[in-house]
Amino acid sequence: MRLAKEVEAALDLLIIFLAQATYVSVNTVRWIILVKGRRLLASAISFFEVILWVYALGLVVSQLSDPVKVATYALGYAVGALVGSKIEERLALGYVLFQVITTRIGELAPALREHGLGVTDWRAEGRMGQREVLMVVARRKNGPQVVRLLEELDPQAFVVQLDASWYRGGFIQKMLQ
């Protein structure tokens, strides 16, 4: 009888942890989807998210005097935040903008175009003389490939990667899709 109660208590803790970790993971992904402009999908996800939240909270609220259950709930939250951020990283939704400043005027833009990237370039004046500024928009999931390519083609280039929350027109890479 005592063993059955211990197993039930351990199972309760596991359920609290998993429900909370799942809720926070889903919450994190939903917020990213919302920020990326996918309102309808984010709204649909929120329905299931709230069910998880109410369920996990209900398991703990009735027993707030049990510090182990409260700690398990908090641990589920922390793990859920980590898992949610990893899921979001793997989904890599959206686009990134690379702004590249190079001294290799006339060399880097054609090389990037040969790799299927859309590049807009212009001449600029820097502290140390003439530079070329390149602007490249890519899918976020292809961002690491673009970074590796830039490092390979011009290790001395100054590169800034920005989140491109919206774009219209232009040429988005064909090869790296």
UniProtKB/Swiss-Prot annotation:
The keyword Transmembrane applies. It is a multi-pass membrane protein. InterPro entries: DUF2179 (IPR019264), DUF5698 (IPR044035), N-reg_PII/ATP_PRibTrfase_C (IPR015867), UPF0316 (IPR022930). It is found in: Cell membrane. Belongs to the UPF0316 family. NCBIfam families: PRK04164.1-5. Coiled coil: none annotated. GO terms for cellular component: plasma membrane. This is UPF0316 protein STH2077. Its main location: membrane. Keywords: Cell membrane, Membrane, Transmembrane, Transmembrane helix. It comes from Symbiobacterium thermophilum (strain DSM 24528 / JCM 14929 / IAM 14863 / T). The chain crosses the membrane at residues 9-29, 41-61.
